[in-house]
C-alpha cells in the first residue's frame, strides 16, 4: 500500500527544508545510501519564473539536493524540457541561484537507452540517467493539464522521454485520454521513482 504524507509550508526555506527532510526521511530515508547516484527529477517544462508556479520551485529542488548530500550520495538534477533550452529554464527559474555552492550535477537529459515498458508499447527511449540511477526523487509540480486535467507524480516521469520523442508519443496517443494515461502509467512503472514529493 502506498504511503502518503502531507505537510503545509510556504517557500520560506527555514520552514520548507525541515518539512521536506521529514517527508523524504519517512518515505525513503532508508533507500538512499552513501555513494549512490540519485536523480532528482523536477518538472522543468518550459520558460517560467518561480512566481509563475508552473515549474517545481527552486527551493524544493535545493532541499532535495541538500538531503541527498547529507546522506553522502551524489545528486543530479535533470529534465528534458518540451520547450526551450534546459540552461535558460534553470536560469529563469532561479535554480542556478538556489543550487549555487552545492556539489550537484545540473544538466539536461541527453543520452538514452531502450526500456521495455510492456504491451502494447514495447521498447521506448528513456533517459540513460533515469534508467541507471540508484535512486530517483520525483519532484512534480501540481498544476492543470489540457488533456489529463492534472499534472501530478505519474505524468512527471514522462519527462524522462528525451526531447522531441515526447511529442511523438503525444501524437501517437492523439486525443485518446485513456490511451495516453496508460502510456504514462507504463512509463512510471518502468522507470520506478523511489519517492515522489509533489510541490503544490
Where are these regions (language model features)?
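N-terminal and secondary-structure boundary signal
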Residues: 1-200
